[in-house]
Amino acid sequence: DIEDFYTSETCPYKNDSQLAWDTCSGGTGNCGTVCCGQCFSFPVSQSCAGMADSNDCPNA
């Protein structure tokens, strides 16, 4: 279940069917809600655009 897979304490997801970004709970980075499913310490929304899953995401 995608909702379960991308849910975490440090990086809440938005229930979107497209690539969408939300602020991390720490307030210092961006969350990849569909692409990365995890938080980064730098903005990655541009880097993640068009990526399908966490295997394609840049390292934090």
Curated annotation (Swiss-Prot):
<protein>
    <recommendedName>
        <fullName>Mating pheromone En-2</fullName>
    </recommendedName>
</protein>
<dbReference type="GO" id="GO:0005576">
    <property type="term" value="C:extracellular region"/>
</dbReference>
<comment type="function">
    <text>Mating ciliate pheromones (or gamones) are diffusible extracellular communication signals that distinguish different intraspecific classes of cells commonly referred to as 'mating types'. They prepare the latter for conjugation by changing their cell surface properties.</text>
</comment>
<feature type="disulfide bond">
    <location>
        <begin position="31"/>
        <end position="57"/>
    </location>
</feature>
<feature type="disulfide bond">
    <location>
        <begin position="36"/>
        <end position="48"/>
    </location>
</feature>
<keyword id="KW-0588">Pheromone</keyword>
<feature type="disulfide bond">
    <location>
        <begin position="24"/>
        <end position="35"/>
    </location>
</feature>
<keyword id="KW-1015">Disulfide bond</keyword>
<feature type="disulfide bond">
    <location>
        <begin position="11"/>
        <end position="39"/>
    </location>
</feature>
<keyword id="KW-0964">Secreted</keyword>
<dbReference type="GO" id="GO:0005186">
    <property type="term" value="F:pheromone activity"/>
</dbReference>
